[in-house]
Amino acid sequence: MKIGDIDLGEKPVLLAPMEDVTDASFRIVCKRFGADMVYTEFVPSDGLIRDAAKAIAKMKTSDDEAPIGIQIYGNNPEAMVEAAKMADNADQIAGGHGCDVIDINFGCPVSKIAGRGAGSGMMREPDKMVMITKSIVEAVRKPVTVKTRLGWDEDSKIIVELAERLQDTGIKALTVHGRTRCQMYKGEADWTLIGKIKENPRMHIPIIGNGDINSAQKAKDAFDRFGVDSIMVGRASFGHPWIFHEIKHVLQTGEEAAPMSVNDRVALAKWHLSLSTALKGPVTGILEMRRHLACYFKGLPDFKETRVKLVTAPTAEEVDALLDYISERWGNCPLNETSSVYGL
């Protein structure tokens, strides 16, 4: 599969953009486990054109993450075009690698974004959505992609027709999450309409399916049943970035990968922590790692007290000591028989 000139190989598995999750350290971790392409957190168009430091910082990437997409969102057409131009030149503005793809967020359902007419709020204004997309495609050099949903609600699932219109603007790929905005993340994702987009003989750009890919078998089923060109993994990667390895292993061999041992998880947590503190400093790096540390050891028996200590430890040294303790106490946990299979 290609996005523009970017060859992602056969059946690529992508990391979805997620606010407060897909920062640089997590993106590097997911790449290490086999993600074929990763995306930044959501970058607000109004923040970029105001020269807001936080928005600009979200565009800083590294060669270790490539290929990478910068995802922008907003409702104002002029601001979105200007933000796209800035993303197009992110290497000069924010430093680092820059971006390989500019992705437009027409899918986020949270109220603070959709309620302002951005993200999946744009599903109520498909003409404006198409106009913004076309204007961005014409304004930048990098390939442009779109991520969106089935529609605003159950009565307005417009994605099959809208996919054609978006393709006609010149985008190079389309990602569709199998829920409406009003569903948020409730219930199960419905991939039926994603499959119908692929069945449309007029569609020629890659279609990337998203929604509830929380196991290697579900990933395989998505490719087999709905014929998508690629899948995008979101929430299931949080606390479980090795899901990319698990998916690739099933796709390539037909067999389940060996489980991630406690010792491997400890090694991963230490590496991830070192990345986070190196990129964000010892204070912020530890604070923002806590959400990941809390999830890396799900399923361990009698772990509650240690989890509390893990997410409140104020220094990297104390976190490291707790991780060593986890390895000593739970390293032979029968839920995780194997060790060091991931080469960490």
Regions found by a protein language model. Give the residues of each.
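Alpha/beta catalytic cores of nucleotide-metabolism and tRNA/nucleoside-modifying enzymes
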Residues: 1-4, 9, 19, 24-25, ...
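Glycine-rich, positively charged N-terminal anion/phosphate-binding segment
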Residues: 1-4, 9, 18-94
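Alpha/beta enzyme core
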Residues: 81-118, 126-205
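Methionine-biased hydrophobic packing positions in alpha-helices, especially
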Residues: 18, 80, 106, 122-123, ...
